Swiss-Prot record:
Taxonomic placement: Bacteria, Pseudomonadati, Pseudomonadota, Betaproteobacteria, Neisseriales
Annotated S-S bridges: none
Record-linked PANTHER family: NICOTINATE-NUCLEOTIDE ADENYLYLTRANSFERASE-RELATED, PHOSPHOPANTETHEINE ADENYLYLTRANSFERASE
Task performed by this protein: Catalyzes the reversible adenylation of nicotinate mononucleotide (NaMN) to nicotinic acid adenine dinucleotide (NaAD).
Record-level GO BP terms: NAD biosynthetic process
Species of origin: Laribacter hongkongensis (strain HLHK9)
Catalysed reaction equations from the record: nicotinate beta-D-ribonucleotide + ATP + H(+) = deamido-NAD(+) + diphosphate
Keywords (A to Z) from UniProt: ATP-binding, NAD, Nucleotide-binding, Nucleotidyltransferase, Pyridine nucleotide biosynthesis, Transferase
E.C. code: 2.7.7.18
Gene responsible for this protein: nadD
Signal peptide: none
Any one GO molecular-function label of the UniProt entry: nicotinate-nucleotide adenylyltransferase activity
Protein name listed in UniProt: Probable nicotinate-nucleotide adenylyltransferase
Family that this chain belongs to: Belongs to the NadD family.
Entry-linked Pfam families: CTP_transf_like
Length: 220
């Protein structure tokens, strides 16, 4: 008889620069569709493959906490901001797996664009030994357009038998309406003195204006 994992945790990493309604919709979808008691949002440090972020880590963390206030089951995990991790997803997941133990079900959220480049991630195949992947795909998503190695994993790892789900190694697509919100466009609007195109929680918008964040970024 298969013993079901006693703990199931959703994990959503990102720069959150700034956190906006699109992020919150994704986190809620992960929580609700997979019936998770907890979804942890992990703000990134300085990613190893990207330019420095626009807002300081302390500000991104403060905005994320404001955005999640009153959101049941959505919490902040700030470990990647410590500077002690590599910034690679596989290393973060390995640390969380050590903390939760082998029987916890971990779900790492990725977008369809991230899935399409998964084979370029650091030690990407090791991810499946550490967690499941929950994929936020847009309507009309075509798995046939994925790189062959990723498409093979997509086909082989589909989560179907939830009564006997292992702690890691499966893939599930989340059913979402389109989320077409650009953090770049939000920052450009804020640089012009705008309100973030209406995509920011009031507390986050007020924090940005109070601390004069994103004012130096040139509008795009």
């Amino acid at each position: 008889m298969t013993v079901l994992p006693r703990v199931a945790i959703g994990l959503f990493g990102g720069s959150f620069d700034p956190v906006h309604e699109g992020h919150l919709r994704l986190a809620r979808a992960l929580r609700d569709e997979l019936q998770l008691a907890e979804v942890r949002l992990l703000p990134a440090g300085t990613p190893p493959h990207r330019a420095p972020l626009a807002a300081a880590a302390a500000d991104r963390l403060a905005m994320l906490r404001l955005a999640l206030a009153g959101e049941p089951g959505l919490t902040v995990d700030e470990r990647e901001l410590s500077g002690r991790l590599s910034g690679y997803t596989v290393d973060t997941l390995a640390m969380i797996r050590r903390e939760t133990g082998p029987e916890a079900a971990l779900w790492w959220l990725v977008g369809g664009d991230q899935l399409a480049s998964l084979d370029r991630w650091h030690r990407w195949r090791d991810l499946f030994g550490l967690a499941h992947l929950a994929v936020a795909v847009r309507p009309g998503f075509d798995a046939g357009s994925l790189p062959p190695a990723v498409a093979a994993e997509w086909q082989a790892r589909q989560a179907t038998d939830f009564a006997n789900l292992p702690p890691a190694g499966r893939i599930r697509a989340l059913s979402l309406s389109p989320v077409d919100i650009s953090a770049t466009a939000i920052r450009a609007d804020l640089a012009r003195g705008g309100d973030g195109l209406g995509h920011l929680a009031p507390a986050v918008r007020d924090y940005i204006h109070l601390h004069r964040l994103y004012r130096s970024e040139s509008p795009a």
